[in-house]
Amino acid sequence: MPFVPHTEQEVREMLDAIGVERIEDLFDEIPESLRKASIDAIPAGMNEMEVTQLMRRRAAQDVQPACFVGAGAYDHHVPAAVWEITTRGEFYSAYTPYQAEASQGTLQLLYEFQTMMSELTGLYASNASLYDGATALAEAVLMAVRANRKVKSKRVLMPRSVHPYYRRVVETIVANQGIELVEAPLDDTVGRIDPEALGRFEDEPFAAVVIPQPNFFGALEEVDRLTDWAHGLNALVIAVCNPVALALLTPPGEWGTEGADIACGEGQPLGIPLSSGGPYFGYMTTRKQHVRQLPGRIVGRTVDADGRTGYTLTLQAREQHIRRSKATSNICTNQGLMVTAATVHLSLLGAEGLARVAAVSHERTRELVQKLTAIDGVERLFDGPFFHEVPVRIPAPAEEVLPMLANRGVLGGYDLSQEFPEWGPALLICATETRTSEEIDRFAAALADALRNTGQRARA
Protein backbone atom coordinates (compact mmCIF):
# COMPACT_ATOMS: atom_id res chain seq x y z
CA MET A 1 0.00 0.00 0.00
CA PRO A 2 1.53 3.38 -0.97
CA PHE A 3 2.27 5.87 1.79
CA VAL A 4 -0.29 8.68 1.68
CA PRO A 5 0.75 11.74 3.77
CA HIS A 6 -1.54 14.22 5.44
CA THR A 7 -3.36 16.58 3.12
CA GLU A 8 -2.59 20.30 3.18
CA GLN A 9 -5.96 20.91 4.84
CA GLU A 10 -5.17 18.40 7.62
CA VAL A 11 -1.75 19.96 8.20
CA ARG A 12 -3.33 23.43 8.42
CA GLU A 13 -5.90 22.22 10.95
CA MET A 14 -3.20 20.64 13.14
CA LEU A 15 -1.03 23.76 13.07
CA ASP A 16 -4.01 25.95 13.97
CA ALA A 17 -4.90 23.64 16.84
CA ILE A 18 -1.48 24.06 18.47
CA GLY A 19 -1.12 27.74 17.58
CA VAL A 20 1.80 27.45 15.15
CA GLU A 21 1.98 29.19 11.80
CA ARG A 22 4.40 26.92 9.93
CA ILE A 23 5.85 23.41 10.36
CA GLU A 24 9.33 24.98 10.49
CA ASP A 25 8.30 26.82 13.67
CA LEU A 26 8.20 23.47 15.46
CA PHE A 27 11.98 23.27 15.12
CA ASP A 28 12.93 26.88 15.82
CA GLU A 29 14.96 25.84 18.88
CA ILE A 30 17.45 24.11 16.57
CA PRO A 31 19.88 26.53 14.86
CA GLU A 32 19.07 26.93 11.19
CA SER A 33 22.60 26.00 10.15
CA LEU A 34 22.28 22.61 11.79
CA ARG A 35 18.87 21.94 10.30
CA LYS A 36 19.82 22.76 6.74
CA ALA A 37 23.21 21.05 6.78
CA SER A 38 21.63 17.62 6.95
CA ILE A 39 18.79 18.06 4.46
CA ASP A 40 20.11 20.32 1.70
CA ALA A 41 21.24 17.34 -0.37
CA ILE A 42 17.91 15.53 -0.14
CA PRO A 43 16.25 15.58 -3.59
CA ALA A 44 12.67 16.52 -4.27
CA GLY A 45 10.00 13.94 -3.59
CA MET A 46 9.23 11.24 -6.17
CA ASN A 47 6.09 9.38 -7.03
CA GLU A 48 5.85 5.59 -6.72
CA MET A 49 6.90 4.87 -10.31
CA GLU A 50 9.96 7.12 -10.04
CA VAL A 51 11.03 5.48 -6.78
CA THR A 52 10.70 2.03 -8.37
CA GLN A 53 12.84 3.10 -11.32
CA LEU A 54 15.46 4.57 -8.97
CA MET A 55 15.64 1.37 -6.93
CA ARG A 56 16.11 -0.70 -10.08
CA ARG A 57 19.01 1.51 -11.14
CA ARG A 58 20.56 1.23 -7.69
CA ALA A 59 20.13 -2.56 -7.63
CA ALA A 60 21.82 -2.85 -11.02
CA GLN A 61 24.94 -1.29 -9.48
CA ASP A 62 25.31 -4.12 -6.97
CA VAL A 63 27.86 -6.82 -7.69
CA GLN A 64 28.31 -10.19 -6.02
CA PRO A 65 32.00 -10.60 -5.14
CA ALA A 66 33.61 -14.01 -4.76
CA CYS A 67 33.56 -14.65 -1.01
CA PHE A 68 36.63 -16.25 0.56
CA VAL A 69 35.72 -15.09 4.08
CA GLY A 70 34.68 -17.67 6.66
CA ALA A 71 35.44 -17.03 10.32
CA GLY A 72 32.13 -18.43 11.52
CA ALA A 73 29.70 -17.73 8.65
CA TYR A 74 29.99 -19.58 5.35
CA ASP A 75 28.84 -19.10 1.77
CA HIS A 76 27.27 -22.48 1.00
CA HIS A 77 24.80 -23.22 -1.78
CA VAL A 78 21.20 -23.20 -0.58
CA PRO A 79 18.78 -25.04 -2.90
CA ALA A 80 15.88 -22.86 -4.04
CA ALA A 81 13.39 -25.30 -2.55
CA VAL A 82 14.68 -24.63 0.98
CA TRP A 83 13.26 -21.14 1.38
CA GLU A 84 10.35 -21.80 -0.97
CA ILE A 85 9.14 -24.38 1.55
CA THR A 86 10.27 -22.49 4.66
CA THR A 87 8.28 -19.37 3.76
CA ARG A 88 5.02 -21.22 3.19
CA GLY A 89 2.28 -19.93 5.44
CA GLU A 90 2.16 -23.20 7.39
CA PHE A 91 5.75 -22.70 8.59
CA TYR A 92 6.34 -18.96 8.35
CA SER A 93 6.40 -18.21 12.06
CA ALA A 94 9.19 -18.43 14.63
CA TYR A 95 6.78 -18.67 17.54
CA THR A 96 6.75 -21.61 19.91
CA PRO A 97 4.00 -24.17 19.15
CA TYR A 98 2.47 -24.37 22.64
CA GLN A 99 -0.87 -25.64 21.31
CA ALA A 100 0.20 -29.12 20.25
CA GLU A 101 -3.14 -30.17 18.77
CA ALA A 102 -2.95 -27.27 16.30
CA SER A 103 0.79 -27.45 15.60
CA GLN A 104 1.61 -31.03 14.66
CA GLY A 105 3.35 -30.05 11.42
CA THR A 106 5.72 -27.59 13.08
CA LEU A 107 6.34 -29.92 16.02
CA GLN A 108 7.16 -32.86 13.75
CA LEU A 109 9.57 -30.69 11.78
CA LEU A 110 11.35 -29.63 14.99
CA TYR A 111 11.47 -33.26 16.10
CA GLU A 112 13.06 -34.23 12.77
CA PHE A 113 15.62 -31.44 13.24
CA GLN A 114 16.49 -32.75 16.70
CA THR A 115 16.87 -36.26 15.29
CA MET A 116 19.19 -35.07 12.52
CA MET A 117 21.38 -33.09 14.92
CA SER A 118 21.58 -36.04 17.31
CA GLU A 119 22.71 -38.27 14.45
CA LEU A 120 25.19 -35.70 13.20
CA THR A 121 26.78 -35.19 16.62
CA GLY A 122 26.43 -38.76 17.89
CA LEU A 123 24.68 -37.66 21.08
CA TYR A 124 21.37 -38.73 22.60
CA ALA A 125 19.23 -35.59 22.60
CA SER A 126 19.00 -32.21 20.92
CA ASN A 127 17.05 -29.08 21.72
CA ALA A 128 15.03 -27.16 19.13
CA SER A 129 17.72 -24.46 18.68
CA LEU A 130 19.35 -21.48 20.35
CA TYR A 131 20.03 -17.98 19.09
CA ASP A 132 23.43 -18.53 17.43
CA GLY A 133 26.72 -20.35 17.85
CA ALA A 134 28.19 -17.91 20.37
CA THR A 135 25.21 -17.94 22.74
CA ALA A 136 24.94 -21.72 22.29
CA LEU A 137 28.48 -22.04 23.66
CA ALA A 138 27.61 -19.74 26.55
CA GLU A 139 24.56 -21.87 27.35
CA ALA A 140 26.74 -24.99 27.13
CA VAL A 141 29.18 -23.54 29.68
CA LEU A 142 26.33 -22.72 32.07
CA MET A 143 24.85 -26.17 31.54
CA ALA A 144 28.17 -27.93 32.18
CA VAL A 145 28.67 -26.10 35.47
CA ARG A 146 25.16 -27.16 36.56
CA ALA A 147 25.46 -30.73 35.31
CA ASN A 148 28.90 -31.68 36.63
CA ARG A 149 28.16 -33.45 39.92
CA LYS A 150 31.72 -34.74 40.38
CA VAL A 151 33.45 -31.36 40.42
CA LYS A 152 32.04 -28.35 42.24
CA SER A 153 34.40 -25.96 40.46
CA LYS A 154 33.04 -23.09 38.40
CA ARG A 155 36.16 -22.91 36.26
CA VAL A 156 36.02 -23.74 32.54
CA LEU A 157 39.05 -24.29 30.31
CA MET A 158 38.51 -22.20 27.16
CA PRO A 159 41.16 -22.64 24.42
CA ARG A 160 42.50 -19.69 22.48
CA SER A 161 41.58 -21.63 19.33
CA VAL A 162 37.87 -20.95 19.96
CA HIS A 163 36.39 -18.13 17.86
CA PRO A 164 37.35 -14.84 19.57
CA TYR A 165 33.80 -13.51 19.23
CA TYR A 166 32.46 -16.64 20.90
CA ARG A 167 34.89 -16.18 23.78
CA ARG A 168 33.76 -12.59 24.24
CA VAL A 169 30.08 -13.53 24.27
CA VAL A 170 30.70 -16.30 26.80
CA GLU A 171 32.70 -13.92 29.01
CA THR A 172 29.87 -11.39 28.89
CA ILE A 173 27.19 -13.92 29.81
CA VAL A 174 29.03 -15.75 32.60
CA ALA A 175 30.92 -12.76 34.05
CA ASN A 176 28.39 -12.11 36.81
CA GLN A 177 27.64 -15.75 37.57
CA GLY A 178 30.85 -16.65 39.35
CA ILE A 179 32.22 -18.68 36.44
CA GLU A 180 35.90 -18.29 35.58
CA LEU A 181 37.19 -18.89 32.06
CA VAL A 182 40.80 -20.10 31.94
CA GLU A 183 42.65 -19.85 28.63
CA ALA A 184 44.27 -23.02 27.29
CA PRO A 185 47.53 -22.48 25.37
CA LEU A 186 47.85 -22.66 21.61
CA ASP A 187 50.58 -24.50 19.72
CA ASP A 188 51.74 -21.79 17.30
CA THR A 189 53.26 -24.32 14.91
CA VAL A 190 50.01 -26.14 14.15
CA GLY A 191 47.35 -23.64 15.29
CA ARG A 192 45.59 -25.87 17.79
CA ILE A 193 45.57 -26.80 21.48
CA ASP A 194 48.91 -28.09 22.72
CA PRO A 195 48.12 -31.26 24.72
CA GLU A 196 51.62 -31.31 26.18
CA ALA A 197 51.09 -27.86 27.70
CA LEU A 198 47.94 -28.96 29.53
CA GLY A 199 49.92 -30.77 32.21
CA ARG A 200 50.08 -27.64 34.33
CA PHE A 201 46.28 -27.76 34.70
CA GLU A 202 46.09 -31.33 36.03
CA ASP A 203 46.01 -30.27 39.67
CA GLU A 204 43.30 -27.67 39.05
CA PRO A 205 39.58 -28.55 39.15
CA PHE A 206 37.52 -27.69 36.06
CA ALA A 207 33.80 -28.12 35.50
CA ALA A 208 34.31 -28.36 31.75
CA VAL A 209 36.81 -28.21 28.91
CA VAL A 210 35.82 -26.64 25.58
CA ILE A 211 37.13 -28.34 22.43
CA PRO A 212 36.47 -26.74 19.01
CA GLN A 213 36.43 -28.96 15.91
CA PRO A 214 37.50 -27.61 13.52
CA ASN A 215 38.80 -24.65 15.47
CA PHE A 216 38.67 -20.95 14.54
CA PHE A 217 41.73 -21.35 12.32
CA GLY A 218 40.24 -24.31 10.45
CA ALA A 219 42.71 -26.70 12.10
CA LEU A 220 41.65 -30.10 13.39
CA GLU A 221 42.17 -30.61 17.10
CA GLU A 222 43.39 -33.85 18.69
CA VAL A 223 39.90 -34.47 20.00
CA ASP A 224 40.34 -38.04 21.24
CA ARG A 225 43.38 -37.19 23.33
CA LEU A 226 41.85 -33.98 24.66
CA THR A 227 38.54 -35.64 25.55
CA ASP A 228 40.19 -38.43 27.52
CA TRP A 229 42.44 -35.91 29.28
CA ALA A 230 39.43 -33.81 30.32
CA HIS A 231 37.46 -36.81 31.55
CA GLY A 232 40.52 -37.87 33.54
CA LEU A 233 40.03 -34.65 35.51
CA ASN A 234 36.27 -35.35 35.90
CA ALA A 235 35.56 -32.34 33.68
CA LEU A 236 32.73 -32.42 31.15
CA VAL A 237 33.67 -31.96 27.50
CA ILE A 238 31.94 -29.28 25.43
CA ALA A 239 32.41 -29.75 21.69
CA VAL A 240 32.03 -26.68 19.45
CA CYS A 241 31.60 -27.97 15.92
CA ASN A 242 30.85 -26.85 12.39
CA PRO A 243 27.89 -29.12 11.51
CA VAL A 244 28.98 -29.47 7.87
CA ALA A 245 32.40 -30.73 8.95
CA LEU A 246 30.70 -33.41 11.07
CA ALA A 247 29.52 -35.05 7.85
CA LEU A 248 33.14 -36.22 7.43
CA LEU A 249 34.75 -35.99 10.87
CA THR A 250 34.24 -38.20 13.90
CA PRO A 251 31.09 -37.03 15.73
CA PRO A 252 31.60 -35.61 19.24
CA GLY A 253 29.69 -38.49 20.80
CA GLU A 254 32.50 -40.80 19.68
CA TRP A 255 35.48 -38.71 20.77
CA GLY A 256 37.93 -40.55 22.98
CA THR A 257 36.85 -43.42 25.18
CA GLU A 258 33.51 -42.00 26.35
CA GLY A 259 32.66 -39.21 23.90
CA ALA A 260 31.92 -35.54 24.49
CA ASP A 261 29.19 -34.62 26.97
CA ILE A 262 27.74 -31.60 25.14
CA ALA A 263 27.99 -30.47 21.52
CA CYS A 264 27.02 -27.04 20.28
CA GLY A 265 27.74 -24.63 17.47
CA GLU A 266 26.50 -22.38 14.72
CA GLY A 267 23.79 -23.75 12.42
CA GLN A 268 24.16 -21.11 9.67
CA PRO A 269 25.98 -23.48 7.25
CA LEU A 270 22.82 -25.60 7.09
CA GLY A 271 20.74 -23.63 4.62
CA ILE A 272 20.91 -20.12 6.08
CA PRO A 273 22.25 -17.48 3.65
CA LEU A 274 24.83 -14.91 4.66
CA SER A 275 22.89 -11.88 5.86
CA SER A 276 24.89 -9.20 7.67
CA GLY A 277 25.36 -11.38 10.72
CA GLY A 278 21.95 -13.00 10.99
CA PRO A 279 19.45 -14.18 11.81
CA TYR A 280 21.25 -17.50 12.25
CA PHE A 281 20.68 -20.23 14.85
CA GLY A 282 22.59 -22.27 17.38
CA TYR A 283 22.30 -25.97 18.08
CA MET A 284 23.00 -28.09 21.16
CA THR A 285 22.98 -31.82 21.82
CA THR A 286 23.90 -33.82 24.91
CA ARG A 287 24.04 -37.21 26.58
CA LYS A 288 20.92 -38.80 28.06
CA GLN A 289 21.91 -38.17 31.68
CA HIS A 290 22.15 -34.42 31.08
CA VAL A 291 18.86 -33.90 29.21
CA ARG A 292 17.14 -32.19 32.15
CA GLN A 293 19.88 -29.56 32.18
CA LEU A 294 19.47 -28.81 28.47
CA PRO A 295 18.35 -25.22 27.72
CA GLY A 296 15.60 -24.34 25.26
CA ARG A 297 12.63 -26.18 23.81
CA ILE A 298 12.59 -29.95 23.38
CA VAL A 299 10.01 -31.69 21.21
CA GLY A 300 9.07 -35.27 22.08
CA ARG A 301 7.18 -37.98 20.22
CA THR A 302 4.41 -39.99 21.85
CA VAL A 303 1.07 -41.66 21.04
CA ASP A 304 -2.42 -40.44 21.88
CA ALA A 305 -5.30 -42.41 23.41
CA ASP A 306 -6.06 -43.90 19.99
CA GLY A 307 -2.49 -45.03 19.40
CA ARG A 308 -1.70 -42.32 16.85
CA THR A 309 1.74 -40.72 16.79
CA GLY A 310 1.80 -37.20 18.19
CA TYR A 311 4.41 -34.55 18.92
CA THR A 312 4.51 -32.12 21.81
CA LEU A 313 6.85 -29.91 23.80
CA THR A 314 8.30 -32.01 26.60
CA LEU A 315 10.27 -31.56 29.84
CA GLN A 316 8.91 -28.02 30.06
CA ALA A 317 9.59 -27.81 33.80
CA ARG A 318 13.15 -26.80 32.81
CA GLU A 319 11.94 -23.65 31.09
CA GLN A 320 11.51 -20.03 32.10
CA HIS A 321 7.76 -19.84 31.42
CA ILE A 322 7.33 -22.37 34.26
CA ARG A 323 10.40 -22.16 36.49
CA ARG A 324 11.17 -18.47 35.95
CA SER A 325 14.48 -17.66 37.69
CA LYS A 326 15.16 -21.35 38.38
CA ALA A 327 14.97 -22.33 34.71
CA THR A 328 17.95 -23.79 32.87
CA SER A 329 17.91 -20.75 30.57
CA ASN A 330 15.90 -17.63 29.84
CA ILE A 331 15.62 -18.50 26.13
CA CYS A 332 12.00 -18.90 25.10
CA THR A 333 10.81 -18.37 21.51
CA ASN A 334 13.77 -19.72 19.56
CA GLN A 335 15.05 -19.53 15.99
CA GLY A 336 12.24 -21.74 14.70
CA LEU A 337 12.14 -20.31 11.19
CA MET A 338 15.89 -20.81 10.73
CA VAL A 339 15.55 -24.35 12.03
CA THR A 340 12.78 -24.97 9.52
CA ALA A 341 15.15 -23.98 6.72
CA ALA A 342 17.93 -26.14 8.16
CA THR A 343 15.64 -29.16 8.40
CA VAL A 344 14.50 -28.76 4.81
CA HIS A 345 18.11 -28.23 3.72
CA LEU A 346 19.33 -31.39 5.46
CA SER A 347 16.38 -33.38 4.13
CA LEU A 348 17.12 -32.32 0.56
CA LEU A 349 20.86 -33.04 0.80
CA GLY A 350 20.71 -36.23 2.82
CA ALA A 351 23.74 -37.72 4.55
CA GLU A 352 25.61 -38.33 1.29
CA GLY A 353 24.87 -34.86 -0.04
CA LEU A 354 26.10 -33.17 3.13
CA ALA A 355 29.26 -35.27 3.07
CA ARG A 356 29.81 -34.26 -0.56
CA VAL A 357 29.45 -30.57 0.37
CA ALA A 358 32.06 -31.02 3.09
CA ALA A 359 34.44 -32.95 0.82
CA VAL A 360 34.23 -30.47 -2.05
CA SER A 361 34.71 -27.56 0.37
CA HIS A 362 37.92 -29.20 1.60
CA GLU A 363 39.11 -29.81 -1.97
CA ARG A 364 38.43 -26.20 -2.97
CA THR A 365 40.37 -24.97 0.07
CA ARG A 366 43.35 -27.18 -0.80
CA GLU A 367 43.32 -25.72 -4.31
CA LEU A 368 43.08 -22.20 -2.88
CA VAL A 369 46.03 -22.74 -0.55
CA GLN A 370 48.11 -24.21 -3.36
CA LYS A 371 47.45 -21.22 -5.64
CA LEU A 372 48.01 -18.54 -3.00
CA THR A 373 51.17 -20.01 -1.49
CA ALA A 374 52.71 -20.03 -4.97
CA ILE A 375 52.84 -16.22 -4.68
CA ASP A 376 56.12 -14.81 -3.35
CA GLY A 377 55.87 -14.00 0.34
CA VAL A 378 52.60 -15.88 0.95
CA GLU A 379 52.85 -18.93 3.19
CA ARG A 380 50.71 -21.00 5.52
CA LEU A 381 50.77 -19.75 9.06
CA PHE A 382 50.44 -23.27 10.50
CA ASP A 383 51.23 -26.80 9.45
CA GLY A 384 48.79 -29.63 10.09
CA PRO A 385 45.41 -30.86 8.84
CA PHE A 386 42.52 -28.48 8.19
CA PHE A 387 38.91 -28.53 7.02
CA HIS A 388 37.95 -25.56 4.82
CA GLU A 389 39.76 -22.63 6.41
CA VAL A 390 43.48 -21.86 6.51
CA PRO A 391 45.47 -18.89 7.87
CA VAL A 392 48.12 -17.52 5.49
CA ARG A 393 50.84 -14.98 6.20
CA ILE A 394 51.19 -12.16 3.65
CA PRO A 395 54.06 -9.67 3.20
CA ALA A 396 51.87 -6.57 3.49
CA PRO A 397 49.29 -5.26 5.99
CA ALA A 398 45.93 -6.97 5.52
CA GLU A 399 44.15 -3.65 6.06
CA GLU A 400 45.80 -2.38 2.85
CA VAL A 401 45.44 -5.56 0.82
CA LEU A 402 41.77 -6.37 1.50
CA PRO A 403 40.34 -3.14 -0.03
CA MET A 404 42.41 -3.76 -3.17
CA LEU A 405 40.97 -7.26 -3.44
CA ALA A 406 37.45 -5.92 -2.90
CA ASN A 407 37.95 -3.53 -5.81
CA ARG A 408 38.70 -6.60 -7.94
CA GLY A 409 35.50 -8.35 -6.84
CA VAL A 410 37.11 -10.59 -4.22
CA LEU A 411 36.34 -10.74 -0.49
CA GLY A 412 39.81 -11.94 0.41
CA GLY A 413 39.52 -13.32 3.91
CA TYR A 414 39.42 -12.30 7.56
CA ASP A 415 42.16 -10.03 8.91
CA LEU A 416 43.73 -12.05 11.73
CA SER A 417 45.84 -9.13 12.91
CA GLN A 418 42.70 -7.72 14.53
CA GLU A 419 42.72 -10.47 17.14
CA PHE A 420 46.24 -11.90 16.85
CA PRO A 421 48.61 -9.00 16.09
CA GLU A 422 51.63 -10.98 17.29
CA TRP A 423 51.48 -13.09 14.13
CA GLY A 424 51.97 -10.14 11.83
CA PRO A 425 49.91 -9.58 8.66
CA ALA A 426 47.80 -12.68 8.08
CA LEU A 427 44.50 -13.66 6.48
CA LEU A 428 42.11 -16.45 7.42
CA ILE A 429 40.90 -17.71 4.04
CA CYS A 430 38.03 -20.08 3.33
CA ALA A 431 36.56 -21.86 0.32
CA THR A 432 33.28 -23.74 0.16
CA GLU A 433 31.73 -25.83 -2.58
CA THR A 434 30.40 -22.64 -4.20
CA ARG A 435 33.86 -21.34 -5.15
CA THR A 436 35.08 -22.23 -8.64
CA SER A 437 38.59 -22.73 -9.99
CA GLU A 438 38.15 -19.55 -12.04
CA GLU A 439 37.33 -17.57 -8.89
CA ILE A 440 40.33 -19.05 -7.09
CA ASP A 441 42.58 -18.04 -10.00
CA ARG A 442 41.07 -14.55 -9.89
CA PHE A 443 41.78 -14.32 -6.16
CA ALA A 444 45.39 -15.41 -6.68
CA ALA A 445 45.93 -12.89 -9.50
CA ALA A 446 44.32 -10.07 -7.51
CA LEU A 447 46.39 -10.88 -4.42
CA ALA A 448 49.63 -10.96 -6.42
CA ASP A 449 48.80 -7.57 -7.95
CA ALA A 450 47.86 -6.10 -4.57
CA LEU A 451 51.10 -7.27 -2.98
CA ARG A 452 53.12 -5.81 -5.86
CA ASN A 453 51.33 -2.49 -5.48
CA THR A 454 51.87 -2.33 -1.72
CA GLY A 455 55.52 -3.29 -2.21
CA GLN A 456 56.04 -0.52 -4.77
CA ARG A 457 54.44 2.02 -2.44
CA ALA A 458 56.63 0.87 0.44
CA ARG A 459 59.80 1.25 -1.67
CA ALA A 460 58.68 4.70 -2.85
UniProtKB/Swiss-Prot annotation:
Gene3D superfamilies: Aspartate Aminotransferase, domain 1 (3.90.1150.10), Type I PLP-dependent aspartate aminotransferase-like (Major domain) (3.40.640.10). Keywords: Oxidoreductase. InterPro entries: GcvPA, GDC-P_N, GDC_P, PyrdxlP-dep_Trfase, PyrdxlP-dep_Trfase_major, PyrdxlP-dep_Trfase_small. Disulfide bonds: none annotated. Pfam families: GDC-P. Its EC number is 1.4.4.2. GO terms for molecular function: glycine dehydrogenase (decarboxylating) activity. CDD domains: GDC-P. One of its GO terms (biological process) is nucleoside metabolic process. The glycine cleavage system catalyzes the degradation of glycine. The P protein binds the alpha-amino group of glycine through its pyridoxal phosphate cofactor; CO(2) is released and the remaining methylamine moiety is then transferred to the lipoamide cofactor of the H protein. The glycine cleavage system is composed of four proteins: P, T, L and H. In this organism, the P 'protein' is a heterodimer of two subunits. Belongs to the GcvP family. N-terminal subunit subfamily. This is Probable glycine dehydrogenase (decarboxylating) subunit 1. It comes from Halorhodospira halophila (strain DSM 244 / SL1) (Ectothiorhodospira halophila (strain DSM 244 / SL1)).
